[in-house]
Amino acid sequence: MLGTSNLKVTALALVLYIPALALASDLPDSTLTPGAINPYVTQQNIHKTVCVKGYTKTIRPPAHFTNKLKKQQMREYGYADRNPKHYEEDHLIALSIGGAPDDPNNLWPEPRISEWNAKKKDRLEFVLYKMVCRQEISLTEAQHAMATNWIEAWKQYVPSHQHYR
């Protein structure tokens, strides 16, 4: 009996000391990545900022910044899969709808291998960008939809806007 008791205590100690690892989620952890907006982009200036062709290229942070941040955030998220190639360091609120370019609160390691992956989110980003620039939706409404739950936003907006290519 004493041996069984020691084994249980040892097993419990191992469980307590193993760092928590998580599977990547399709949605970011809202406490780690709540989203952040670019204060220089407003509804009044969208046709001079986000709606100008090539705008996002002028504000996108350099790869050395996002690659370093991706590795740091993968640890913070506790992802079990630590291969950086399996993630895209993505803006929760897209640059094309006024997301903050280099605020870590707006960046997260988004899974590439999943049903709701980075490619699907890119489609939503384009649809919301077109809707904002065509004034079908307000800038703040698009930002809120993306930050709150981008999967639900995809379901709401993408199927009804298939003509946006």
Predicted regions, residues:
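Nuclease and nuclease-like effector domains acting on nucleic acids or nucleotide cofactors
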Residues: 2-9, 15-87, 96-165
